[in-house]
């Protein structure tokens, strides 16, 4: 008699995705982040659902409803801080996941990679709209500044911004629609994640060496389920340390002041996970140019497969490309730091240099180093 997990239509899908899935025998801890992202998504949906039960999407009551959640709702404070800091953990895992894909050449699975880029954009949009909901000073001014960037689009820009706002400024209509989108987008993300997995399981996972591993596969369960649970324990430990000891570490103090359209904060900045893109935006004096650079800073990931010149897929045995990759990581950290600094000398110059370096590494130096390494192989 066939095992029910192999014969039942629904159980069969789960079995082929998480139990009997053939996985390379040598994948490292860098392959944990996919499952951690799934856990983060479930955590965000659950905590978000409980927050939505008590939150009111109205400019008059939004700020006080968040205060009410923290003060009066049973364990409301922990739900709120798990949701806010869960977003930070989500982005840490996302950046690690994308970085691993770049380092080990996983972008050669073009369908999986492109769905991943779409997922990244969707998660960023969701996080941005979520940041607006508490209706603090930084929420309001962040929403005003970022949505106003669309006015740089020729001809339709101003109309588009007013259409998104639902009026002539960020107001009740904006908050209501942002809440609606913030609620629905995680479910769209879940569907996209399922498609992401579907495409991945068509090709099978990549591995650190970058070579075909069909001759050396092991079942996903118990080997990688145990490995993923270890990663999950580390994630929960980090999240709970953040939530229970310093829940406001990654937030902005300005967001504890209710939104006031008549008083602009001295320095408007988004959450830390957008600072690298914000620094690139600010490094270009022209508004439209800045917006294009902002979009391209993420969209550039889509052309990485086209710029792969090396004969080897992974960077595991390519020391020059490895150096360049870690330069890129350092550059992104510098951009993140600059994004949180005021617009003054020397931060402007550092931001411009770091932005030029970012695009140069990805568009020019990576392909050149790949070609050089091909030549070195012939020596």
From Swiss-Prot:
Any Pfam family the entry gives: Cytochrom_B_C
GO biological process terms held by the UniProt record: mitochondrial electron transport, ubiquinol to cytochrome c
Keywords: Electron transport, Heme, Iron, Membrane, Metal-binding, Mitochondrion, Mitochondrion inner membrane, Respiratory chain, Transmembrane, Transmembrane helix, Transport, Ubiquinone
Domain of life from the UniProt record: Eukaryota
Cofactor(s) needed: heme b
Gene3D superfamilies reported in the protein's UniProt record: Cytochrome Bc1 Complex, Chain C (1.20.810.10)
GO molecular function ontology, one term from the record: ubiquinol-cytochrome-c reductase activity
Membrane spanning residue stretches: 33-53, 77-98, 113-133, 178-198, 226-246, 288-308, 320-340, 347-367
PROSITE patterns: CYTB_CTER, CYTB_NTER
Entry note: cofactor: Binds 2 heme b groups non-covalently.
One GO cellular component term: respiratory chain complex III
Subcellular location: Mitochondrion inner membrane
Entry membrane topology: Multi-pass membrane protein
Annotated residues for binding of heme b b566: 97, 196
Quaternary structure (record): The cytochrome bc1 complex contains 11 subunits: 3 respiratory subunits (MT-CYB, CYC1 and UQCRFS1), 2 core proteins (UQCRC1 and UQCRC2) and 6 low-molecular weight proteins (UQCRH/QCR6, UQCRB/QCR7, UQCRQ/QCR8, UQCR10/QCR9, UQCR11/QCR10 and a cleavage product of UQCRFS1). This cytochrome bc1 complex then forms a dimer.
Role according to the record: Component of the ubiquinol-cytochrome c reductase complex (complex III or cytochrome b-c1 complex) that is part of the mitochondrial respiratory chain. The b-c1 complex mediates electron transfer from ubiquinol to cytochrome c. Contributes to the generation of a proton gradient across the mitochondrial membrane that is then used for ATP synthesis.
Name of the molecule in the record: Cytochrome b
Species this chain originates from: Viverra tangalunga
Gene name for this UniProt entry: MT-CYB
């Amino acid at each position: 008699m066939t095992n029910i997990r192999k014969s039942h239509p629904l159980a069969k899908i789960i079995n082929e995705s998480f139990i009997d899935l053939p996985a390379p025998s040598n994948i490292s801890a860098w392959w944990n982040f996919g499952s951690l992202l799934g856990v983060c998504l479930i955590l965000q949906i659950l905590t978000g659902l409980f927050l939505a039960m008590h939150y009111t999407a109205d400019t008059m009551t939004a700020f006080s409803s968040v205060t009410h959640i923290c003060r009066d709702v049973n364990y409301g404070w922990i739900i709120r801080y798990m949701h806010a800091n869960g977003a930070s953990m989500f982005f840490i895992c996302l950046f690690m996941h994308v970085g691993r894909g770049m380092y080990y050449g996983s972008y050669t699975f073009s369908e999986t990679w492109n769905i991943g880029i779409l997922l990244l954009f969707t998660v960023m949009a969701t996080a941005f709209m979520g940041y607006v909901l508490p209706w603090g000073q930084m929420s309001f001014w962040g929403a005003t500044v970022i949505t106003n960037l669309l006015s740089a689009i020729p001809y339709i820009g101003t109309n588009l911004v007013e259409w998104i706002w639902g009026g002539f400024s960020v107001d009740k209509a904006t908050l209501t629609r942002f809440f609606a989108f913030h609620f629905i987008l995680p479910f769209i993300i879940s569907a996209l994640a399922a498609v992401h997995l579907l495409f991945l399981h068509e090709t099978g996972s990549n591995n650190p060496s970058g070579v075909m591993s069909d001759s050396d596969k092991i079942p996903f369960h118990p080997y990688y389920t145990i490995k993923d649970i270890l990663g999950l324990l580390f994630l929960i430990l980090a999240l709970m340390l953040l939530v229970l000891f310093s829940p406001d570490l990654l937030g902005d103090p300005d967001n504890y002041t209710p939104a006031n359209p008549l008083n602009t904060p001295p320095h408007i900045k988004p959450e830390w996970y957008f600072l690298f893109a914000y620094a690139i935006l600010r490094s270009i004096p022209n508004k439209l140019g800045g917006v294009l650079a902002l979009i391209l800073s993420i969209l550039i990931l889509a052309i990485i497969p086209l710029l792969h010149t090396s004969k080897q897929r992974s960077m595991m045995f390519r020391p020059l490309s490895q150096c360049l990759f870690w330069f890129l990581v350092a550059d992104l950290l510098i951009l993140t730091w600059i994004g949180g600094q005021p617009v003054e000398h020397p931060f402007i110059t550092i931001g411009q240099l770091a932005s030029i370096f970012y695009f140069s590494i990805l568009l020019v130096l990576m392909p050149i180093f790949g070609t050089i390494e091909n030549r070195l192989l012939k020596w």
